[in-house]
């Protein structure tokens, strides 16, 4: 089980933040999870490099720059600096942070494309697209708006309805218009270029006429499904494997890798006004970031890049969110293997982060930017808290601020830091801030921290190996449970020996207790280093140690004795609940100000007046949600069962998932349109409608009085 038994060469990446918005806690979660793993690998002596970059191409970046009156290059330069500042403020330590708009990325993208093309994995065909004659550009689906052809909701996107969850083609949208200028688009044909993903799945192999095939082409020994099932690349998560099996069973489709100009990105070789789709060159940004780093830092090792990207004895490890699983487990490995590179060794998939039991919400102040968090709270505290919640799966994580306060104040400040602070101030001052020697009793405690045998699964192992294994498996919650338990043991030793009494009665005995406590705390700081590096380094600084904490120092032969200890400086304060409240309130006010700015000149809607007779036809009743769950294939919908008293239980598909998680809805009383004609949807029958106000993350369900009963009619 010992993860450090052999030397490893590892290249690690986290997903690239997109360059049209600020860094928020979702980005920070992934950065911290990855950084902890990288720091651990380095701390046990492995060769490990951590790369990332800003994802800079695509229509949204081009339009954001146009809106600001600057060039895309100017926009991504500024945003890239902001992203790097915000991510590194949480102690995320990249070996290199780059931009996908780089010469290296363009060269590698071109190389991969031309190799895929030479091997017959590229095709082209004409497709119909919406085109804005005013803006002189083909419109992506998200830049077309209109009325949903299914439920007739207005102001819906060109590819799916956020109200009913229907998916459709932009040409099916009613009264469609360009979201930039408001004019109706026309349909034009355009040749697009496709990557033949099915070439890398044996199930999808099809016969091809002899006239169109070169026998040396369309041949690949790499089968995606076999790779997924046998390599262990995503083996730890049943949810991941289930989703991949669904995609394989449905068959892998050709992937459109081109976009028509105007477009901010790299032009496709040998094409006119055609650009690589952002998702082609974005993951190649991992390669370009590493290439730029290796060329600068290893000038005498020209094969350093190939030693990772073409050598399967090295490891390539990606950390990603579950929303980009398709790209990283299907397109990306196929592109690499089809162009003479190698597929990743591991793709670690994590869930999303919510705040106080709900999705991050701008209206509630819980859509928290990294910059705002750092303004009010200690980033090390978030690292500790997230680590305490992170396991090897892809479950979503909830940042409950009440739990955050309790866990940080109790387990970190009140336990692990407390053992240091309680012996490092007045007691050590009275001892001329000089350590003594470790007593026999103290040595037993230190050996317990370093070598004790602990049950693990069906067997047992040393505490060091268990912590190392848990780190390597990304089971950070297990790591912190073990370290906190050891911290309890150290504090119990301090309580039992009461050095604040000994300093008056037996100063040399007090010196022994302080020496044991600080040595034990130093070893805990090593264990903790990947999670809270700054706190661990502060403990090292206190002990006058110049090096960074390293797992090689987890050895009783490295006990510190008879050394001078520096004056104590505050290591970390407790979390202030008031700071959290101020932060959330500032977020709310900021969002409110934005809404006021954008609504200074609202377009008046035509109001439709109805008679009292019309209103009487609508039967509004109190309902109580008795069951709620997600809807497969519809990210915006929640399927709820609503108890309407004498009317029984009705099934409803509600477009509320942007603001409410299904697991938080059970038992909630709501207001329901109870006599709505049942509507057949592709997911099932929806028999009623929940009343709500607001849009997007500001959406709020109408909640009746607490004494209202299911079935009560509103009058």
UniProtKB/Swiss-Prot annotation:
Lineage per the UniProt record: Bacteria, Pseudomonadati, Spirochaetota, Spirochaetia, Leptospirales
Subunit and interaction comment: Homodimer.
Cofactor(s) demanded: Zn(2+)
EC code(s) of this entry: 6.1.1.10
Protein's UniProt keywords contain Ubl conjugation: no
Localisation: Cytoplasm
Species in which this protein is naturally found: Leptospira interrogans serogroup Icterohaemorrhagiae serovar copenhageni (strain Fiocruz L1-130)
Database matches in Gene3D superfamilies: HUPs, Isoleucyl-tRNA Synthetase, Domain 1, Methionyl-tRNA synthetase, Zn-domain, Nucleic acid-binding proteins
Sequence motif: 'KMSKS' region, positions: 359-363
Cofactor note: Binds 1 zinc ion per subunit.
A Pfam family assignment: tRNA_bind
Amino acids binding Zn(2+): 148, 151, 161, 164
Listed name of the protein: Methionine--tRNA ligase
Function (record text): Is required not only for elongation of protein synthesis but also for the initiation of all mRNA translation through initiator tRNA(fMet) aminoacylation.
A biological process term (GO) from this entry: methionyl-tRNA aminoacylation
Reactions mediated catalytically: tRNA(Met) + L-methionine + ATP = L-methionyl-tRNA(Met) + AMP + diphosphate
């Amino acid at each position: 089980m010992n993860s450090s038994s052999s030397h490893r060469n590892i290249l690690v990446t986290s997903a690239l933040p997109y360059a049209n918005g600020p860094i928020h806690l979702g980005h920070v979660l992934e950065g911290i999870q990855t950084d902890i793993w990288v720091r651990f690998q380095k701390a046990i002596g492995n060769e490990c490099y951590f790369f990332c970059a800003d994802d800079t191409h695509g229509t949204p970046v081009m339009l954001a720059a146009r809106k600001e009156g600057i060039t895309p290059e100017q926009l991504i330069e500024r945003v890239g600096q902001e992203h790097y500042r915000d991510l590194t403020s949480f102690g995320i330590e990249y070996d290199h942070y780059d931009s996908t708009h780089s010469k290296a990325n363009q060269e590698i993208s071109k190389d991969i494309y031309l190799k895929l093309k030479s091997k017959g994995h590229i095709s082209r065909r004409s497709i119909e697209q919406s085109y804005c004659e005013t803006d002189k550009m083909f419109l992506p689906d998200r830049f077309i708006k209109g009325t949903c052809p299914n439920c007739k909701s207005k102001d819906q996107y060109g590819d799916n309805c956020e109200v009913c969850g229907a998916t459709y083609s932009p040409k099916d949208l009613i009264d469609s218009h360009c979201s930039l200028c408001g004019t109706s688009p026309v349909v034009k044909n355009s040749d697009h270029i496709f990557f033949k993903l099915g070439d890398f799945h044996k199930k999808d192999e099809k016969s091809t006429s002899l006239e169109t095939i070169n026998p040396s082409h369309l041949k690949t020994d790499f089968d995606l499904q076999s790779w997924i099932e046998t390599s262990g690349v995503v083996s730890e998560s049943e949810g991941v494997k289930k989703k991949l099996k669904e995609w394989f069973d449905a068959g892998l489709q050709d992937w459109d890798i081109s976009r028509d100009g105007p477009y901010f990105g790299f032009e496709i070789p040998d094409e006119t006004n055609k650009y690589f789709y952002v998702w082609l060159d974005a993951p190649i940004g991992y390669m370009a970031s590493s290439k730029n780093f290796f060329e600068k830092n290893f000038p005498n090792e020209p094969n350093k890049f190939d030693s990772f990207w073409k050598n399967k004895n090295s490891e390539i490890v990606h950390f990603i969110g579950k929303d980009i699983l398709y790209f990283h487990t299907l397109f990306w490995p196929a592109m690499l293997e089809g162009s003479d590179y190698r597929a990743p060794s591991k793709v670690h998939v994590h869930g999303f982060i919510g705040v106080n039991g709900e999705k991050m919400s701008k209206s509630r102040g819980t859509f928290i930017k990294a910059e705002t968090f750092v303004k009010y709270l200690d980033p090390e505290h978030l690292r500790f808290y997230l680590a305490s919640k992170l396991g090897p799966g892809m479950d979503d994580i909830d940042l409950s601020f009440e739990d955050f306060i309790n866990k940080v104040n109790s387990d970190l400040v009140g336990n692990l830091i407390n053992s240091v602070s309680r012996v490092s101030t007045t007691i050590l001052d009275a001892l001329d801030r000089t350590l003594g020697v470790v007593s026999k009793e103290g040595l037993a405690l230190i050996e317990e921290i370093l070598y004790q045998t602990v049950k693990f699964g069906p067997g047992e192992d040393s505490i060091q190996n268990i912590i190392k294994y848990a780190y390597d498996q990304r089971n950070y919650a297990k790591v912190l449970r073990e370290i906190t338990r050891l911290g309890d043991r150290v504090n119990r030793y301090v309580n039992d020996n009461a050095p604040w009494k000994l300093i008056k009665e037996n100063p040399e005995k007090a010196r022994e207790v302080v020496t044991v406590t600080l040595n034990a705390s130093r070893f805990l700081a090593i264990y903790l280093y990947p999670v809270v590096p700054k706190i661990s380094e502060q403990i090292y600084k206190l002990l006058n140690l110049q090096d960074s904490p390293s797992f090689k120092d987890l050895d009783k032969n490295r006990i510190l004795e008879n050394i001078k200890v520096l004056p104590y400086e505050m290591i970390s304060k407790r979390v202030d609940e008031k700071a959290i409240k101020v932060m959330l309130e500032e977020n709310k006010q900021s969002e409110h100000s934005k809404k006021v700015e954008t609504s200074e000149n609202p377009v008046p809607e035509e109001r439709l007046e109805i008679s009292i007779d019309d209103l009487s036809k609508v039967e509004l009743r109190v309902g109580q949600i008795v069951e709620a769950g997600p809807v497969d294939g519809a990210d915006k919908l929640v399927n709820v069962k609503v108890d309407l008293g004498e009317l029984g239980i009705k099934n409803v598909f509600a477009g509320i998932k942007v603001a409410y998680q299904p697991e938080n809805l059970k038992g909630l009383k709501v207001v329901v349109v109870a006599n709505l004609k049942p509507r057949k949807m592709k997911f099932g029958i929806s028999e009623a409608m929940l009343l709500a106000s607001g849009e997007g993350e500001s959406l709020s369900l109408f909640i009746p009085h607490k004494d209202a009963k299911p079935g009560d009619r509103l009058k």
